[in-house]
Amino acid sequence: MPKICYEVRGEYALFTNPMTKTGGDLHSYPVPTCSAVTGLTESIYWKPSIKWKPLRIRILNPIRYQSRSKLLPVYKTGGKDLGYYSYLRDVCYQIEVEMAWGSERYASDRNVAKHYESMLRWLRRGGKLPVHLGITECFAYVRPCLFGDGEGYYDAVDMDFGVMVHSRDFEKGVIRLAPYRMHQGVICFPDQEECITRTGRAGGD
C-alpha cells in the first residue's frame, strides 16, 4: 500500500497521557504519540474505507516546554479554577504513514489511486479538516515533504522517552503502551501486536 510523507509544524502542541488526564493541569509528552499522529493524518484526509498506519516520525526542532495558566470552569460550583498547561513550543515534525484498508462494510470503495490522489490534494491544501497538535487550540500547518530532507536538531542524537501511549481501542476500553526510542532523530512506531495493553480511561491524546 502507498506511503505518504508530510511535514507538520505549529507554535504550540500538547500531547497528553489519557491515563493521567485528570484535574485542571495538563503536561505534554515530549513527542507525539502514535494515536496523535493518526488523528493528525485523519484530519488531512480520511474515509471509512481506509485507515492510516503511522510508521515513523522525525523530530526537527528542539524539544522545549512553555507553561501557561488557564481559567477553567468548575462545573459543580459554577465558578472557575486556575489550571496550568505545559505545552511543547515551536514544534516541527516529518511524518511517514501507510495507507491500509478500513471497514469491510466499505469494501466497494477500495480504490488505491483515488484515495492516494485525494490525500495528496488535501495535503497540498493544508488538510480537509482543521489540523491540531493534540488539542484544538494548538493549530498546525501541514505540507508534503520528503522524509529525511533537510537538517534536524536531533540528527546525531539517540534518546529514550520511556513507555508512552501508543493507541487506544475505545470499544474494548483498552490502551496500548509502547517504549518510544529515538535514533538519530527518528522514532519508529511499533505494530499494535507488539504493545503492552492496559485497561483505563480513553480521553485525550
Where are these regions (language model features)?
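N-terminal, Lys/Arg- and Ser/Thr-rich interaction peptides
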Residues: 1-24, 183-197
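Extracellular structured ligand-interaction cores
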Residues: 3, 54, 90-94
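Beta-strand elements of well-folded, non-transmembrane domains
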Residues: 8-14, 61, 95-103
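Short, hydrophobic/aromatic beta-strand segments
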Residues: 17, 52-53, 106-107
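Surface-exposed beta-strand edges and their flanking turn/coil or helix-capping segments
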Residues: 18-23, 65-74, 108-110
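Short, flexible N-terminal segments of the mature chain
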Residues: 20-40, 117-130
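Glycine/small-residue-rich interface belts in oligomeric ring/scaffold proteins
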Residues: 27-67
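Internal, well-folded beta-alpha domain core
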Residues: 72-205
